[in-house]
Amino acid sequence: MESTIDVLKNRRSVKSFKDNQISKEDLESILSAAKNAPSGMNLQSPKILVIQRKKIIERLSQWNKSFYPKEIVDSLPDDFDPFYNAPTLLIILVDKNVNTCVEDGSLVIGNILNAASSLGIGSCWIHRAREEFDSLQGKELLKVWGLSEDYIGVGHVVLGYPNDEFTFNKKEIKEDYVVYVDDLI
């Protein structure tokens, strides 16, 4: 297992997955890391939805794609899958009544991405969850799933074993990413 610092420095988004499902043990380890993410005042506003049924993931993927801007959809191949055919999909929702809800959900996603990487599992943060769950269809899904309409989407995470041919790009870090401040007005 890589050191924590190495995982944080080397993790990359994976967008090509093998068909086989991740193990229950690995999924539980990832979810444990997610549940232990910091949250404002320890209010723990996030909910993590776990979807592993291929047909449900396919339907949610098409729904997600419907929120892309038209000019992007027009530039994509017809068979483009925003969830990259991953066998596991996590949806991170948060209670909008908690002041730090988006930050809390983002920390959960960060823990998921890094825990997955430490286990050799590929992951990618997929956007448009907010748009999905702000919509009427999203509100209906929340009801179906037994959740309050107070939940909003922060993001999706796809998980799976990376395809053998998938290559990780070297991450270029901006030179001005960190600014040291040593004076005040």
Residue locations for each model-derived region?
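Acidic, surface-exposed loops and disordered segments
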Residues: M1-I185
